[in-house]
Amino acid sequence: MRQHVNPLSRFFQLPRPLPSPEEMFAQSSRPLHLDIGCARGGFLLSLAPLQPEWNHVGVEIRHPLVLSAERDRQELELDNLRFLFCNVNVSLEEWLDALPRDQLQWVSIQFPDPWFKRRHQKRRVLQPSLLIALATALQPGRELFIQSDVLSVIEPMVMLIEQSNCFERPKNDSHAWQKANPLPVPTERERYVLDQGLQVYRRLYQRNDQQAPELSNLEALWQQVDNPSKEEHSDC
């Protein structure tokens, strides 16, 4: 059972200083994979040993999950993985701005909490300011991967990403939704959904060479995004 927290509550609006790659990793110059909303960390705990040439950072807003994930990481002695507690829409932009050029090479947002209602729009994980920060940190050709089992969760993300004009789908990807996960291990949620015979909606994007838009312009477009597939979740 997924337990939500309100990212707009006062506690989660307090900025948290995040450690730099140099503070987290002995080999800090490795390419960096950022997993936003890593939950208990099972995905990264499985991925990090398979990709020792990468550093992996998982960020999560639920502190008990981060503590649990860090304990597991330490037991496994994974030196190319760290888990951080923060509200990404409060604390991540400054951290991204400080990264060395082209260190961030892959971003994943997988099965984010489903805030359906329009009045909860600002609680969704992918906000315009975060997308612009990611687009600024990612160099052309670097990748952003999103997936969810809820169409009305991923469609607004897709619309926001595509309205930014900063990302394009790979030229050989002509399907509405990507069939296979490009990553070598699934998340816990992904395994559960597929075991139930249900669909997972996926999109892989590559950063293009377009300049990131002004925040006010993207926010204006974002206000038009209102869960096109799930009318039953809209406010009365």
UniProtKB/Swiss-Prot annotation:
Name the residues that bind substrate.
K117, D149
Gene symbol here is: trmB
Query: What positions does UniProt annotate as the active site of this protein?
Result: D113
Check the record and name the PANTHER family matching this protein: 3-DEOXY-D-MANNO-OCTULOSONIC-ACID TRANSFERASE/TRNA GUANINE-N 7 - -METHYLTRANSFERASE, TRNA (GUANINE-N(7)-)-METHYLTRANSFERASE
Provide a Gene Ontology MF annotation, just one: tRNA (guanine(46)-N7)-methyltransferase activity
Q: Which reaction does it catalyse?
A: guanosine(46) in tRNA + S-adenosyl-L-methionine = N(7)-methylguanosine(46) in tRNA + S-adenosyl-L-homocysteine
Name a GO CC annotation attached to this entry.
tRNA methyltransferase complex
UniProt record similarity statement: Belongs to the class I-like SAM-binding methyltransferase superfamily. TrmB family.
Metabolic or biological pathway: tRNA modification; N(7)-methylguanine-tRNA biosynthesis
For this entry, the protein name equals tRNA (guanine-N(7)-)-methyltransferase
Describe the task this protein carries out: Catalyzes the formation of N(7)-methylguanine at position 46 (m7G46) in tRNA.
User: Which Gene3D superfamilies does the entry mention?
Assistant: Vaccinia Virus protein VP39
E.C. number, please? 2.1.1.33
The EC category is transferase
UniProt organism field: Prochlorococcus marinus (strain MIT 9313)
Q: Recite the UniProt keywords alphabetically.
A: Methyltransferase, S-adenosyl-L-methionine, Transferase, tRNA processing
Sites binding S-adenosyl-L-methionine sit at D35, E60, N87, D113
